[in-house]
């Protein structure tokens, strides 16, 4: 299955998602915002989430596959003051994505053309068996 990839996500967030409850993640990284911007939320919409950094993402890396429930991309204004002499106003783009855990996954192939292009991965869902 080919899907968008979110990289460099905290292992604690991934562990919490594996618990099964839907969670909202706020994204600040440009490459993650670009990857999520083209995704349409829905029951058939999946993304791959991993703690591996984008530069290190290779076939064989592990992560999780999640279902995208909602996406919101917005601009935030940031005011910065320095010693009362001047202030600087900046805008920062961020995205919030609500996801629900689907399955553990492994990367088969990585498709990344640059910082301003979405990152896609070909993944397969892995099975986890417990001896009883």
Predicted regions and their residues:
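Short acidic/glycine-rich loop or secondary-structure boundary segments that cap or lie
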Residues: 14-16, 56-59
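A generic structural signal for short beta-strands and their flanking turns/coil linkers
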Residues: 23, 43-45, 62-64
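Hydrophobic beta-strand residues in large extracellular and virion-surface proteins
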Residues: 4-6, 17-20, 45-49, 68, ...
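Short beta-strand-centered aromatic/proline hotspots
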Residues: 58-75
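Contiguous surface segments at macromolecular interaction interfaces
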Residues: 63, 77-132
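Short coil-to-beta transition motif at edge beta-strands of beta-rich domains
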Residues: 36-57
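Compositionally biased, charged N-terminal/linker segments
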Residues: 1-42
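Residues lining hydrophobic/aromatic ligand-binding pockets adjacent to catalytic sites
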Residues: 34-35, 43, 75-81
């Amino acid at each position: 299955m080919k899907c968008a990839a979110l990289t460099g996500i905290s292992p604690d967030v991934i562990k919490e998602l594996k618990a099964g409850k839907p969670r909202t993640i706020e994204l600040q990284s440009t490459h993650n915002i670009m990857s999520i911007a083209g995704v349409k939320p829905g029951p058939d919409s999946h993304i791959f989430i991993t703690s591996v950094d984008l530069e290190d993402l290779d076939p064989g890396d592990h992560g999780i596959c999640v279902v995208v429930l909602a996406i919101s991309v917005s601009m935030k204004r940031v005011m910065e003051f320095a010693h009362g002499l001047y202030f600087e106003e900046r805008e920062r783009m961020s995205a919030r994505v609500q996801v629900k855990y689907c399955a553990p996954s492994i990367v088969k192939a990585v498709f990344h053309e640059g910082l301003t292009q979405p990152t896609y991965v070909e993944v397969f869902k892995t099975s986890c068996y417990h001896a009883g």
